[in-house]
């Protein structure tokens, strides 16, 4: 194998391969990236046995061939080269990396590609075309609410469902819930929901372009994303996702509206002095005014306390709500509206956070005790 290629184009794709590979030590074939030169293309593939990535880039193929090489060191070597083009040559069991007309040479040990896994087949799945902007929005609104508790693996991913041509994504950690629904560009067959790991969603999200669409395909064991010459697959998480519909309030009796940026900036300041273990912040709402405080009125804080008032649209009775400020801050960062609305019936029961005007997503937040 011998190829001549653009450094940045090659580096971009092997860096994605590096993200996929979990094991950064050169101990197995799964620490390697596959390079296959054929025709006028170089195919690049990487896997950690659960997530698989594949793409092809145009190169000048001087001699066809296939090999695998330790991905982490390959990225480091290519990054260090000073030229716009690089030459890769397979010599017996070594990949020689050199820039044209430069007295620089790196040799990396290779492993045979014979035992390297193929890209998983997606036969028998259901498919839906989704605009890339919608998919990015769905990922951004859900990944932060996924549970990190490994003993509850069934909520360690985002629940994805197709209903009447729409795609619905839901995530929860047991104390909050994120919900977003988008219309697909094509309608799939009947389908029961699956749980998609956050790792594949994060990698795909970083590769999405502003325009175009993504073909999302789901089989009994895998999820696939196809777009812009990229192919991604991931093993699904097994288990029964909780019945999230039971925790979504049918109706909230009271609500208040507040500027999104104003609330976000106030949270950032007041949270500097909240108790770091619980992240609890206190919100006092009264007519026309919202007060954020790092402590309750009856508490003493060893470090100190912070308080900030901002205007809000509210006409009900005065109430105090305590909650984990991160559960409010993280959705505010991904909303793009000027205002948000917080709906509630009782300060001790679930709150609903929405954009104003109302869109196709909302967040449910369980409050904390005020004392």
UniProtKB/Swiss-Prot annotation:
It is found in: Cytoplasm. The keyword Magnesium does not apply. SUPFAM superfamilies: DNA clamp. InterPro entries: DNA_clamp_sf, DNA_polIII_beta, DNA_polIII_beta_C, DNA_polIII_beta_cen, DNA_polIII_beta_N. The keyword DNA-binding applies. Its main location: cytoplasm. GO terms for molecular function: 3'-5' exonuclease activity; DNA binding; DNA-directed DNA polymerase activity. Keywords: Cytoplasm, DNA replication, DNA-binding, DNA-directed DNA polymerase, Nucleotidyltransferase, Transferase. One of its GO terms (cellular component) is DNA polymerase III complex. GO terms for biological process: DNA strand elongation involved in DNA replication. Pfam families: DNA_pol3_beta, DNA_pol3_beta_2, DNA_pol3_beta_3. Signal peptide: none annotated. Forms a ring-shaped head-to-tail homodimer around DNA which binds and tethers DNA polymerases and other proteins to the DNA. The DNA replisome complex has a single clamp-loading complex (3 tau and 1 each of delta, delta', psi and chi subunits) which binds 3 Pol III cores (1 core on the leading strand and 2 on the lagging strand) each with a beta sliding clamp dimer. Additional proteins in the replisome are other copies of gamma, psi and chi, Ssb, DNA helicase and RNA primase. Confers DNA tethering and processivity to DNA polymerases and other proteins. Acts as a clamp, forming a ring around DNA (a reaction catalyzed by the clamp-loading complex) which diffuses in an ATP-independent manner freely and bidirectionally along dsDNA. Initially characterized for its ability to contact the catalytic subunit of DNA polymerase III (Pol III), a complex, multichain enzyme responsible for most of the replicative synthesis in bacteria; Pol III exhibits 3'-5' exonuclease proofreading activity. Belongs to the beta sliding clamp family. This is Beta sliding clamp. The lineage of its organism: Bacteria, Pseudomonadati, Spirochaetota, Spirochaetia, Spirochaetales.
């Amino acid at each position: 194998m011998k190829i001549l290629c653009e450094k940045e184009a090659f580096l971009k794709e092997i860096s994605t391969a590096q993200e996929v590979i979990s094991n950064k030590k050169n101990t197995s074939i799964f620490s390697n990236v596959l390079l296959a030169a054929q025709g006028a293309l170089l195919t690049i593939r990487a896997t950690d046995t659960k997530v698989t990535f594949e793409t092809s880039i145009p190169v000048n193929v001087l001699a066809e061939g296939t090999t695998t090489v330790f991905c982490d060191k390959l990225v480091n070597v290519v990054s260090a080269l000073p030229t716009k083009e690089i030459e890769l040559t397979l010599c017996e069991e070594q990949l020689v990396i050199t820039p044209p007309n430069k007295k620089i040479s790196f040799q990396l040990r290779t492993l045979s590609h014979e035992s390297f896994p193929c890209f998983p087949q997606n036969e028998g799945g259901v498919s839906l075309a989704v605009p890339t902007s919608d998919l990015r929005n769905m990922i951004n609104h859900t990944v932060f609410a996924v549970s990190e508790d490994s003993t509850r693996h069934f909520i360690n991913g985002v629940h994805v469902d197709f209903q009447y041509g729409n795609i619905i994504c839901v995530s929860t950690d047991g104390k909050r819930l994120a919900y977003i629904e988008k219309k697909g560009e094509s309608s799939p067959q009947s389908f029961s929901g699956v749980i998609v790991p956050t790792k594949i969603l994060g990698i795909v999200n970083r590769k999405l372009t502003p325009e175009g669409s993504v073909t999302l395909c789901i089989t009994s064991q895998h999820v696939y994303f196809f777009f812009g010459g990229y192919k991604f697959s991931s093993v699904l998480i097994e288990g029964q996702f909780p019945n999230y519909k039971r925790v979504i309030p049918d109706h909230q009796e009271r609500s208040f509206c507040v500027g999104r940026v104003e609330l976000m900036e106030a949270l950032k300041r007041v949270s500097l002095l909240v108790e770091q273990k619980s992240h609890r912040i206190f919100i006092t709402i009264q007519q026309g005014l919202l007060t954020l405080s790092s402590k309750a009125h009856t508490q003493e804080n060893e470090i100190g306390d912070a308080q900030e008032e901002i205007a809000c649209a509210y006409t009900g009775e005065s109430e105090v709500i305590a909650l984990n400020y991160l559960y409010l801050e993280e959705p505010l960062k991904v909303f793009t509206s000027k205002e948000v609305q917080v709906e509630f019936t009782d300060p001790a029961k679930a709150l609903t956070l929405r954009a104003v005007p109302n869109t196709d997503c909302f967040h449910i937040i369980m409050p904390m005790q005020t004392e």
